[in-house]
């Protein structure tokens, strides 16, 4: 949508740079201005609709982050590729309500899933005795949202995290 708006502005600029000899009554210019205004309204409507859907999807979880599964069972590397292709991220809960929203997905499907824990994480939810590097280099969350060290080769539920900053 932004590409269309930019293209319209470019056309308007080209038209203005070429002068008004070809359009002495300003009909073409007015038509371009009307089209641009229509595109701006459409963009505003789409943005509003998108935000409404996003707010509705995140309402129940109390988190602005969405945790979505395709119900596949994969290892960590496959998860990374799937989330990247979907323009999402491997889950990385930064707050308790993020972790609860993530755990709700796992509980609903009765499966565990990978997550990543940043070096400077302010929030963690390690299970007792964790992290345990001997268990593996990756981290998984159980259906209650507790975190456990695990092998990156384990096949777990594919869950990707999506968040929107506008």
Swiss-Prot record:
Where on this protein are sugars attached? 122
Keyword Glycoprotein recorded = yes
Q: Which cysteines are joined by disulfide bonds?
A: 83-160, 138-152
* Coiled-coil residues: none
Tissue expression profile of the protein: Expressed by the liver.
Q: Where is the signal peptide?
A: 1-19
Main location class: secreted
> Domain named C-type lectin: which ranges?
46-161
Task: Note the InterPro entries from the entry.
Answer: C-type_lectin-like, C-type_lectin-like/link_sf, C-type_lectin_CS, CTDL_fold
What GO terms are given for molecular function? Answer: carbohydrate binding; phospholipase A2 inhibitor activity
Give a single Pfam family match: Lectin_C
Q: Where in the cell is it found?
A: Secreted
Q: Which keywords label this protein?
A: Calcium, Disulfide bond, Glycoprotein, Lectin, Phospholipase A2 inhibitor, Secreted, Signal
GO cellular component annotations, sorted alphabetically?
Answer: extracellular region
The family classification in the record reads:
Belongs to the alpha-type phospholipase A2 inhibitor family.
Job description of the protein:
This phospholipase A2 inhibitor binds directly phospholipase A2 in the presence or absence of calcium.
Oligomeric state and interaction partners are given as: Homotrimer; non-covalently linked.
What's the protein name? Answer: Phospholipase A2 inhibitor
Q: Which organism is it from?
A: Bothrops jararaca
């Amino acid at each position: 949508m932004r590409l269309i708006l930019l293209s319209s502005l470019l056309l308007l600029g080209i038209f203005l740079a070429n002068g008004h000899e070809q359009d002495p009554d300003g009909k073409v210019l007015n038509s371009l201005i009307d089209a641009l205004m229509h595109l701006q309204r459409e963009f505003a409507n789409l943005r509003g609709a998108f935000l409404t859907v996003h707010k509705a999807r995140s309402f129940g979880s109390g988190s602005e982050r969405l945790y979505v599964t395709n119900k596949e069972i994969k290892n960590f590397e496959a998860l990374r590729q799937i989330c990247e292709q979907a323009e999402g991220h491997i889950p990385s809960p930064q707050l308790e309500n993020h972790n609860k929203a993530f755990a709700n997905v796992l509980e609903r499907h009765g499966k565990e899933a990978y997550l990543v824990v940043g070096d400077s994480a302010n929030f963690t939810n390690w299970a007792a005795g964790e992290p345990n590097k001997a268990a593996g280099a990756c981290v998984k969350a159980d259906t209650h949202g507790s975190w456990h060290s695990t092998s990156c080769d384990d096949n777990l539920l594919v869950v990707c995290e999506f968040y929107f900053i506008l």
